[in-house]
């Protein structure tokens, strides 16, 4: 009778293995940390288009490349070119301001408190509609977005369109041009 109970317990637990995480987590940060508002993880200050703070809050290095989190502070009515991520999903949460997102053939208008999910492999862009705005956004998995932002931030001159496409592709992004 004990053997039957043992087998029932073991076999009954097998479906629970689907929820187990077998990833090697040895490279993840194992201690809590905070990043102050307006600051980037590791003290790095990244700017979008050389002006708008776009700082890493949680690095892919912290999560074994499973997730990265960024804070964007928009100081004007701008946004990225139409593009597509080959390997990452994105989630945007609007803290302040108003934004228009175009995802595939759908258009969404978001304001403070709204969230949007952008699946990988679907072309998308957004533009800030107010003079000031703030977003928190997540990429899953982290991929090479931090490196992409660092590379773009380090450029001293505006690169050619071909150079922009090459840099994007090196980081898992297909640049499709203006919105």
Locations of regions flagged by a protein language model:
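Histidine-centered catalytic micro-motifs
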Residues: 81-87, 125
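C-terminal segment of N-terminal export signals and the immediately downstream linker at the start
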Residues: 20-51, 154
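Short, conserved beta-strand element in jelly-roll/cupin
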Residues: 73, 86-101
């Amino acid at each position: 009778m004990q053997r039957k109970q043992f087998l029932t317990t073991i076999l009954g637990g097998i479906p629970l293995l689907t929820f187990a995480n077998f990833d090697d987590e040895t490279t993840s940060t194992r201690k809590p940390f905070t990043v102050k508002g307006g600051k980037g993880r590791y003290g790095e200050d990244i700017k979008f288009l050389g002006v708008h703070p776009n700082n890493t809050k949680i690095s892919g290095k912290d999560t074994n490349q499973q997730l990265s989190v960024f804070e964007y502070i928009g100081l004007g009515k701008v946004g990225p070119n139409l593009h597509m991520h080959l390997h990452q999903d994105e989630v945007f949460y609007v803290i302040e301001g108003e934004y228009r997102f175009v995802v595939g053939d759908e258009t969404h208008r978001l304001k403070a408190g709204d969230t949007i999910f952008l699946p990988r492999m679907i072309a998308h862009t957004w533009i800030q509609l107010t003079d000031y705005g703030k977003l928190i956004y997540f990429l899953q998995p982290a991929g090479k977005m931090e490196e992409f932002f660092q590379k773009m931030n380090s450029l001293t001159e505006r690169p050619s369109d071909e150079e922009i496409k090459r840099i994007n592709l090196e980081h898992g992004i297909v640049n499709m041009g203006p919105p």
